[in-house]
Amino acid sequence: MSRVIALLVACLLLASCSSFPRPGGAPPSDGLTAQAIFDRSLAAHGGDLRRHPGDINLSTDGRWYALIQRIQPVVTDAGFRIRSEERYRPSEGLYAVRHTGPDGTKHVVRSTAGLRVAYNGTETDDDEKRAATAMTNDAFRMFHFGPTFFLDRMASLERLPDAREDGRRFHRLLATLRPGFGRAEQDRAVLWIDAGTARLYRIHQTIDGFPTTVGAHVDTTFLEYRAVGPYLLPVRFLERVRGPLRIKAHEWRVTGIDLDRGWRAADVIDPHGFGGAAARPATPIAP
């Protein structure tokens, strides 16, 4: 079976190699700067989440495609990362995620003090798992909470030529991120922003924070949004590998959202589960 998988991957690599977008070509002569387009998108999503004094709580559910699990088993961690409960306090930089899957629970806490990772209630010091988790945790905070993610690490921003898809026009911005995702010193991301609504439609990113993903790039399309209090948050996603091969990787949706429960940091750091005001699942949203 392993030989079959290796042969399949080799064929895909030869047939589907794709490079990450680079600067080039004249941007539209509409007078809009990259920063102006980004600022408009940030405002369309409700502004800078770091100014929100309370908490944001999500539930998610999804599935990983079979081939990506075989190619990147440590990164996908699909035995644990199927559903999640997420607790985010952006003003403090505290992001806690409790994943569940057929193999049990994975509890991840990212804070200004660092990263903690536990499986089935036991904290791990496995460096490979921690490195992969650092990268995916950063990426999913970007997916779920939008333009605010870029404010802390955007070293440069430039405009690429616009693109059209399904009859819609999208501004494209190339951002250089320092640091990158997880342990990467640098990554790049192309933001596709709807020229009409200013919503983020897609993020195309490099993922250099883990040895087996260096040189690869993926895109994630935001297929649906919901208004939650003053914010506009994406709730349905499709992630695809774009290079060095082209395959679907992951699709998921947000199944619950609520704001401002008033939980404490102590309520989300226990690897055995969330407690206090963080304990109950996020309030369900209609599919």
Please describe what each predicted stretch is.
Residues 29-32, 36, 111-187, 207-214, ...:
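Flexible, processing/modification-adjacent segments and terminal tails
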Residues 79, 101, 155, 184-186, ...:
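Short solvent-exposed loop/turn micro-motifs enriched in small/polar/acidic residues
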Residues 13-16:
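C-terminal motif of bacterial Sec signal peptides marking the signal peptidase cleavage site
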Residues 166-269:
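Gly/Pro-enriched, hydrophobic low-complexity segments
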Residues 2-10:
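Sec-dependent signal peptide recognition
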